A protein has these predicted regions:
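Hydrophobic membrane-insertion alpha-helices, especially the h-region
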Residues: 1-3
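Conserved blade-ending motifs and adjacent loop-strand segments that build the rim/top face
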Residues: 368-389
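C-terminal capping alpha-helices of c-type cytochrome domains
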Residues: 390-392, 406-410, 481-525
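Acidic, Gly/Ser/Thr-rich repeat motifs that build Ca2+-stabilized beta-propeller blades
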Residues: 6-215, 268, 328-367, 387-404
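Sequence/structural segment immediately N-terminal to covalent heme-attachment motifs in c-type
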Residues: 418-450, 455-456
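Gly/Gly-Pro-rich "capping" loops immediately C-terminal to redox-active cysteine motifs
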Residues: 445-484, 505-507
Length: 525
């Protein structure tokens, strides 16, 4: 009936809030709107309860619970059935963070780079024939050799033990794999480009793990050398690890910073990857494929309009093409395939982003993406997973845990009900007038988009009284509410009603058509 192009939010009434130190935590909206679908929200901000740093860590769903590791390696267990009480787990891991800080300070380097990017990346909980274990990806500083790697560590969980009761010290972890070679700090560009980590893990089968590794700033542009196209290093690739032998082989090459990885119900492997300034990618991963970095990209070097290593700018010629690319970049992070959430969403991919602070629902059919629906969250989304109850759970850079559930959908009134008493051509003119409203305005509950406020609930609402941020001064200066009288004046002559309004239009001269539009607006409740 009308275009839904943007996510919308209801007023900010939180489902969850905690008293911490005598003050309530911040809250998030308790409802979001996607296209024709209301999403209910449960949310909790961990750093209002525990002292945590922002921008890092990962999450893994276990039944209706989620295991979370923070940027600095603190573990938490979130339970969908008891969402207000997150368990702090007694698990410690050493990555030699303080030693790396001391090293860069001794060299007179800016240690904020280490503080920001030397962190924990991803976590998996795994059960197989050999037992239960936690797998963790993170940076590790090799103090004796003065170099760093991306490491996978493993913690065996007692067979009869519950995860919330596990206690582990740094000595209880085993090293599964360290990326090769161990990297010295760079003399060019960022000395430690830790924001290009990759680090995502996904089981291919019981003893085989896929592991994404970012290029760590070694791209032949901000460095004199790169590893992503050679055989002498792991960086800029997706590796296949044999967990029995600890050996790694290149599964794919030519990646830049693959921060998302999932295997869908058909066995297809999907990865999301950061491009440079533009060119974030959704890739369908096939063993042995070369995805082209750093020779090709749909992005450019930062602050320029070109990527210096590309012979053909912006073409991605000669290498495996992405299934989809975002230009400009969205700051892509992880992704999942949606199963058992909503019938309308079944089998779609849900891609998260940091820069755009948005979920992207993507439908892949017959070899192509047929649509992409943005769902604005307004927080940097670091990770995503789906619980056994079907709910979608997000981990954000500001330590919010957000759980999304399908809500009861609103019903849009049938336009035909409001034009029955009109004769042609007035009937069609009234239908056209109502449709023209929805060229700019949403009719979703609480809908707030960039172009115009939602019409839902407009009747009896204060004039210029919604959460829309871009009302004209002319409309903001008006007193009163939208009722039959004020709506009639507005529809007849908007500029006469609010001189200087940014929404001046010719108006509707026919009072019968104006009445049909007003009756329709009254029904949007």
């Amino acid at each position: 009936m009308f275009p839904y192009k943007y996510l919308t939010e209801l007023p900010q009434v939180a489902l969850l809030s905690k008293q911490v130190g005598g003050a309530a935590t911040a809250t998030l909206p308790n409802t979001l709107m996607s296209a024709f679908t209301r999403l209910d929200v449960k949310s909790l901000q961990l750093d209002a309860i525990y002292p945590l740093e922002h921008n890092g860590g990962g999450m893994f769903a276990i039944g209706n619970r989620a295991l979370i590791v923070s940027k600095r390696g603190k573990f938490f267990l979130y339970d969908s059935d008891d969402a207000a009480n997150v368990r702090d787990l007694d698990i410690s891991v050493n990555i030699n963070y303080q030693e790396f800080l001391s090293f860069v300070n001794s060299k007179g380097l800016d240690d904020k780079i280490v503080q920001n990017w030397f962190r924990f990346i991803d976590v998996l909980y795994h059960e197989d024939s050999s037992g239960k274990s936690l797998l963790l990806s993170h940076y590790y500083w090799h103090a004796q050799d003065e170099c760093f790697t991306v490491r996978i560590s493993r913690l065996n969980v007692p067979e009869d033990g519950e995860l919330e009761n596990v206690s582990a010290t740094t000595d209880d972890w085993n090293t599964v794999y360290d990326t090769k070679p161990c990297l010295k700090i760079k003399p060019k560009g960022f000395y430690f480009a830790g924001h290009f980590s990759g680090g995502r893990m996904e089981f291919l089968k019981e003893d085989e793990l896929l592991f994404t590794v970012g290029f760590l700033g070694f791209d032949g542009n901000a460095s004199d050398y790169f590893y992503s196209q050679g055989t002498d290093g792991d960086y800029g690739k997706i590796l296949k690890l044999d967990l029995q032998t600890g050996q790694a082989t290149d599964f794919t090459i030519g990646q830049r910073n693959p921060q998302g990885l999932t295997i869908d119900s058909k066995g297809r492997i999907w990865s999301t990857e950061h491009g440079p300034q533009g060119g974030d990618e959704l890739n369908l991963i096939e063993q042995g494929a070369n995805y082209g970095w750093p020779y090709v990209t749909y992005g450019t070097d930062y602050g320029t309009t070109r990527w210096p290593l590309s012979e053909s700018q912006g073409r991605h010629d000669g290498y495996r093409l992405p299934i989809f690319s975002w230009v400009p970049s969205i700051g892509v992070s992880n992704l999942i395939e949606i199963q058992g959430f909503l019938p309308e969403w079944e089998g779609d991919l849900l891609v998260t982003s940091m820069k755009q602070q948005t979920l992207f629902r993507m439908r892949y059919r017959e070899g192509r993406v047929v649509f992409v629906e943005p769902i604005k969250i307004d927080l940097r989304i670091r990770d995503i997973d789906q619980l056994d109850n079907g709910n979608i759970i997000l981990w954000t850079d500001k330590t919010w845990i957000i759980e999304l559930t399908p809500g009861e959908n609103f019903i849009t009134p049938d336009i035909a009900d409001f034009v029955r008493e009109l004769e042609e051509p007035e009937k069609q003119q009234a239908i056209n007038a109502i449709h023209s409203c929805h060229v700019c305005h949403s009719a979703a509950p609480g809908g707030v988009i960039e172009t115009a406020p939602s019409l839902w609930g407009v009747f009896d609402r204060k004039i210029a009284g919604s959460r829309f941020r871009h009302y004209s001064p002319a409309l903001r200066s008006k007193q009163g509410h939208w009722n039959e009288e004020t709506l009639n004046l507005w529809l007849e002559d908007s500029n006469g009603f609010a001189k200087g309004t940014s929404m001046a239009y010719p108006g509707i001269a026919n009072p019968a058509i104006r009445k049909a539009v007003i009756d329709y607006l009254k029904a949007l409740q």
